[in-house]
Structures are given as structure tokens and as C-alpha cells.
Amino acid sequence: MLNRNYRGLLGTKLGMTQVWDANNRVVPVTVIQAGPNVVTQVKTPDSDGYSAVQLGYGEIDPRRINKPMRGHFETSGATPRRHLVELRTADAGNYRPGQQLTGEVFDAGQVVDVTGTSKGKGFAGVMKRHGFKGLGAGHGVERKHRSPGSVGGCATPGRVFKGLRMAGRMGHDRVTVAGLTIHAVDTERGFLLIKGAIPGPDGGLVFVRSAAKRPAPEPAAPVAAAAAGTGEEASA
């Protein structure tokens, strides 16, 4: 059973730039247009067997929506959206269909995971695609310098094993970069400034959510308040 509260948003990668931090150091950041997202469905353990929120992002011509999806959006009271994503979170009951979400759901310094579609490289050889060494530059090698070499024996095994790394289309894969830090949140323009690079080209769709491997720290304020109260009583 999921027992963590996650935050997530669909957005658009705008590009990279650099900013100065509090220590006057240059920080490379990626700018993301985060939202606005709209809640199109709320899933609960009673009705769906698990707790999740479905988010919609991006405008689309309503005439391009089929009847099942049109009914789905009408149920939530939201206008049709181009992209949909599901975010599993324990506090899905706090959301309501039609609710608008912006970059304010995140805080500066928060650690997030970013998912996007990597840039397509087209058909690539094994040296570029898999980092093969290639064959020798001389010593009798003729026009095979970037070849992978042997891919299987003649009699044994007499075939090519499944999954053997070969040349082929490179890139355009779903990639997740984990453990990135939000440098700043621009609430006026709806921008997220995330330290480092994220997958995909400028203008590509990305999904930003709370880091899965780094749970949020427990708040220390109640503990400090309780300790202070104990001290006052003891002194009295």
C-alpha cells in the first residue's frame, strides 16, 4: 500500500541557462514551463483499488477528441487536454476533479525525478550506440574499422543470441533522471528552474514528480515545540 504523498506536474522543457546562487557560483539550470495542469480523475482504493490522481496538460482541438475521451473530460468538468498522466499518491483524496495545479506545488531545494523522451539520433552504429571499441586501424583490417566484429559462432551456438547489442535506431527513448534539485520556482510565470540537464529537446514534454528514492524529511518543528514546553514546565 502506498503511504507517501507525491507531487507531480506535466510541463514543457524550454531550454537551459545559468543563474547565480547565494554563494555567487554559476549554476546551470533547465527551465521548465510547469503546468498549468488540471485534475481529470481521482482514483481511490474503494473505487479503483489504489490511490492516484490523473493530470491533464496541453490544449487540443475538441474536434480531435473521440467520444469516450470527450465523456471522460466532461465528467471531470475540464476542457480536453492533449496529454494525460497518472500520479500515484497517498493523499489523492485531497484533490478534486477540475482542480488547477501550477508550479507552486514544488518548493525550492526539493529533490525531484524528471521523465522525458530523449533526443532521437537516427540509425547509429555500435561504436556510437553502445560504445564499442571497433576493430583495429591497421594490420590487415579493410573497411571494417567500425564493425562490431563477430556476433556468434558458426557451429556453436550456431545462432545469434537474443539481445545482442548491434547497430540500430538510437535515442527517442523514455528516460528518467533521478535526484535532481529544484533551484528556484517562478510562480508568476510558472517556471521551474532545475539544476542540471534533463532528457529531451527544447519544447519536449516532461513529467516532474517528487523523488521516489528520497523521502521527504519529517518536520522538526513539533518536536522542538514539545521540547520547549517541557523545559518551561520543568523550570516552573
Curated annotation (Swiss-Prot):
Disulfide bonds: none annotated. One of its GO terms (cellular component) is cytosolic large ribosomal subunit. GO terms for biological process: translation. Residues 221-236 have a biased composition (Low complexity). GO terms for molecular function: rRNA binding; structural constituent of ribosome. InterPro entries: Ribosomal_uL3 (IPR000597), Ribosomal_uL3_bac/org-type (IPR019927), Ribosomal_uL3_CS (IPR019926), Transl_B-barrel_sf (IPR009000). Coiled coil: none annotated. It holds the Pfam family Ribosomal_L3. Transmembrane segments: none annotated. Keywords: Ribonucleoprotein, Ribosomal protein, RNA-binding, rRNA-binding. Residues 215-236 are annotated as: Disordered. It comes from the Bacteria. Part of the 50S ribosomal subunit. Forms a cluster with proteins L14 and L19. One of the primary rRNA binding proteins, it binds directly near the 3'-end of the 23S rRNA, where it nucleates assembly of the 50S subunit. Belongs to the universal ribosomal protein uL3 family. This is Large ribosomal subunit protein uL3. It comes from Parafrankia sp. (strain EAN1pec). The gene is rplC.
